[in-house]
């Protein structure tokens, strides 16, 4: 789990997301509170529950981007899901308890990677020995092995083909079956490979011919797993999920009940009712054992264009006590998005054209013009936030992108006049821009 202070978390988010200081502060404090709880001991630690967050703001203002960056910062089991993917328990579709099962799988993957790093040196030596066996045979003399080992480490044999045999786990693509009417059927799915073992892909794998370069990674993973206690990894991962798991629940506004709508609402209000115990704290049965959700942090977000937060069930509103409102983006925000963020759209466009040998530069007034056009189209057509910049920029670069292979070695300067020539007429014609921008 991360030990960053709230200030450090906010400054890290600032590198990728413009503005939205309140939302950044809220998630930074929530993340730091996870660490603070770990420092407590005794009964008090069990009593400290996470303060779940509801982020409200128009589309394209940074809600989802905050979740993406938070996933990398958290250093804890983190899952981002859309609320619209789920249906009420008892209907065809995924029920919300699948969130916890998926989070456990994420936690196991994180814990396994962490443990693999701790045995990396031993696994490296074992993988190297297996590659040498494939190259020179297990009966080769020590001098021959040493000679090939030197060449292998120097990278001289990377393109040479060898035959290796990997122990294949149960195929992951097998269909999953629900058990209807069985207590704990929420446990969900039984993997046929687990039940029938070797009959459907046991430990014996068939030989494969691959290059030495391609053989290294799977052999390393297999040798690492031989050195690890898989049961201990699962137990630690489940404990980590229960204590530090974070779920980002996107598009929560889409599960608000619509006024005047009758009949069963299996993917709206029914999903809200199913979310209540999950967020409040319950025990979910998974194939790795029961998982308690009492200390999992839930961050919900939604645009609330058609509905409003008060349309959520009152009980669900109460379980999301921290409200954060994200502000719509201004012209200055758009300008900063284009120039200040790491891997900004302009940097990406310049780098992509450079691969064709075309040097593209944007003047200051071109950046201003792009920002202004994006804001104008958002206000006159439909406000889709920062995503509008991608549409406008693609329109501006359309001709250059198409002819770039024939223009290698050229330099192209894009100024405000060029931007206006490409998109101004469309931006001013509201009817036309509805379809093109």
UniProtKB/Swiss-Prot annotation:
GO cellular component terms listed in the entry, alphabetical order: HslUV protease complex
Compartments, as annotated in UniProt: Cytoplasm
Disulfide bonds: none
Keyword Repeat: no
Binding residues annotated for ATP, in chain numbering: 18, 60-65, 250, 315, 387
One Pfam family named in its UniProt record: AAA_2
UniProt superkingdom: Bacteria
NCBIfam families, sorted: hslU, PRK05201.1
Sequence similarity: Belongs to the ClpX chaperone family. HslU subfamily.
Protein name: ATP-dependent protease ATPase subunit HslU
Species name: Methylobacterium sp. (strain 4-46)
């Amino acid at each position: 789990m991360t030990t960053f202070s709230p200030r450090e978390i906010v400054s890290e988010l600032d590198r990728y997301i413009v503005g939205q200081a309140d939302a950044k502060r809220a998630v930074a404090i929530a993340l730091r509170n996870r660490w603070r709880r770990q420092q407590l001991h005794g009964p008090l630690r069990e009593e400290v529950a996470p303060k779940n967050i509801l982020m409200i703001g128009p589309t394209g203002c940074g809600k989802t981007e905050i979740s993406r960056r938070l996933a990398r910062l958290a250093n804890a089991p983190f899952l981002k899901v859309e609320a619209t993917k789920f249906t009420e328990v008892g209907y065809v579709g995924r029920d919300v308890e699948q969130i916890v099962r998926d989070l456990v799988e994420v936690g196991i993957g994180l814990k396994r990677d962490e443990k693999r790093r701790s045995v990396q040196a031993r696994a490296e030596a074992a993988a190297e020995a297996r590659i040498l066996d494939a190259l020179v045979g297990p009966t080769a003399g020590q001098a021959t092995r040493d000679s090939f080992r030197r060449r292998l480490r120097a990278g001289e044999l990377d393109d040479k083909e060898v035959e290796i045999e990997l122990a294949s786990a149960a195929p992951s693509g097998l269909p999953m079956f629900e058990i209807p009417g069985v207590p704990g059927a929420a446990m969900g799915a039984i993997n046929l490979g687990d039940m029938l073992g070797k009959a459907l892909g046991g430990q014996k794998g068939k030989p494969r011919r691959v290059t030495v370069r391609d053989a290294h990674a799977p052999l390393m993973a297999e040798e690492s797993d031989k050195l690890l206690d898989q049961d201990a990894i699962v137990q630690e991962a489940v404990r980590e999920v229960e204590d530090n798991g974070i779920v980002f629940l996107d598009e929560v506004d889409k599960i608000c009940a619509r006024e005047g709508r009758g009949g069963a609402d299996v993917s709206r209000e029914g999903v809200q009712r199913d979310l209540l115990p999950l967020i409040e704290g319950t025990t979910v049965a998974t194939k790795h054992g029961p998982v308690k959700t009492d200390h999992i942090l839930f961050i919900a977000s939604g645009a609330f264009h058609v509905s409003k937060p008060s349309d959520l069930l009152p009980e669900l509103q109460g379980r999301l006590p921290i409200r954060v409102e994200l502000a719509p983006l201004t012209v200055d925000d758009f300008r900063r998005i284009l120039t200040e963020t790491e891997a900004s759209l302009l940097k990406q466009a310049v780098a992509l054209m450079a691969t064709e040998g075309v040097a593209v530069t944007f003047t200051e007034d071109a950046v201003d013009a792009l920002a202004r056009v994006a804001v104008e189209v958002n206000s006159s057509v439909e406000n889709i936030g920062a995503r509008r910049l991608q549409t406008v920029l693609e329109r501006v670069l359309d001709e250059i992108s198409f002819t770039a292979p024939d223009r290698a070695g050229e330099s192209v300067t894009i100024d405000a006049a060029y931007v206006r020539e490409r998109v101004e007429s469309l931006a001013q014609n509201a009817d036309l821009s509805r379809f093109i921008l």
